Amino acid sequence: MYVAKDGYRRLKRGFHSYLDGLKAIHEETRLRHFVRSIEAFIRPDIGKTRKHFVYRGQLFVGHSSEISDLLGNLYGLRSCAEHMNDIHDFYAGLSENEIDKRTATGSFQAEVIANSTYRRVCERPDLLKLFASDGSIKAFWEKDENELREIWGVPVDVSSAVKERFNPYI
C-alpha cells in the first residue's frame, strides 16, 4: 500500500486513523479513529454514511440483525465523538460504570474489525488492489453480494474476539 506513491490514498488515511486509535488513551477517541479507519474501506456515499457503514460493514463481520445493531451502535458512538456530542445522551439512562464498560467494549470491537480488515488486505495483494482508489472501491461495492462474499472470504468473529481477549476492567 505504501510502495505505491500515488495510490491507496483513502486506505492510507484510514490506516493513519487506525494508528491514531492505537495511540489514543480515551475510549471514545479510540473508537472514533477505528470506525473512521473502517470507513476508508466502505467509502460511503454522502448522505448515506451510516446506512452504508452498517450494510457494507457486514461483509467484514457477518450478516445478522445483531451485527447490524453492532455496526449501527459503533457508527452512532463515532458520530458522538466526531461531533463532540455527549456520549451520555447516546446511553441515556445507564449508569456511569455501564457507559464506560459499553464504550470500552465498542472501542475494542471497532479495533478488532479495523485490525482484521487492514491485515486481510495487506496479506492479500489481489484484495488490496481492489481498494487502490475511490473508483476501484466504488467498483468493488457495485459487485453482486455473493461475489463480494466470495472475494472477501470468511468474516471476522467479533463476539469471539471479545470473549477471548477483552477485559473491560483493565
Where are the predicted features?
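Amphipathic, oligomerization/interface secondary-structure segments
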Residues: 1-170
